């Protein structure tokens, strides 16, 4: 029996990297759902991601941020970023309930599809990844990942594969901060 690998896209989010991480996650969902993508969906998702990247968040917290008023208030109160704070307080919270439900439904649908899958949830519902892509890259290790569509299903395979590629891209971009002599 193989141990379940844990993967959290939200970790490692220093101020410099948060925008890259949010952009990477938005790109994943945009590629998976290109046929039903829109500017409002992207705007709300991006603001949600940037907000959660300042927390110790995981994928399912996107749903919680959009639907749980008490949780959202607590998170927004802790924000240092005034632009994000303004989004939640003057845009999102001022929407009529019907308008808000209409705006967040596509996000809940897309993210919820993966969070409700026990297979995906076992991998992404974690505050810390079980391995470091940076460590794999910087120490010359080999990473083998079984993303069999027969075991996971096509959508789940696409999501997990895209998440892994995004983590690899972010780790590669972080290498610019490693001194040349290392």
Question: Whereabouts are the PLM-identified features?
Answer:
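P-loop NTPase motor domains
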Residues: 1-182
């Amino acid at each position: 029996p193989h141990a379940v690998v844990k993967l959290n896209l939200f970790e490692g989010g220093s101020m410099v990297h948060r925008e890259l991480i949010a952009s990477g996650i938005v790109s994943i969902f945009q590629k998976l759902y290109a046929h039903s993508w829109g500017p409002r969906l992207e705007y709300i998702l991006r603001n949600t991601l940037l907000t959660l990247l300042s927390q110790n968040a995981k994928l399912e917290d996107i749903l919680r941020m959009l639907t749980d008023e008490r949780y959202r208030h607590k998170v927004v109160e802790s924000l240092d970023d005034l632009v994000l704070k303004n989004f939640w307080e003057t845009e999102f919270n001022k929407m009529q309930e019907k308008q808000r439900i209409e705006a967040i439904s596509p996000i809940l649908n897309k993210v919820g599809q993966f969070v409700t899958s026990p297979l995906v949830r076992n991998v992404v519902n974690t505050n810390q990844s079980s391995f470091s892509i940076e460590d794999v890259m910087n120490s010359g290790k080999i990473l083998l990942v079984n993303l069999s569509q027969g075991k996971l299903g096509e959508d789940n395979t696409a999501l997990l594969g895209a998440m892994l590629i995004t983590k690899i891209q972010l780790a590669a971009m972080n290498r610019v901060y490693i001194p040349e002599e290392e």
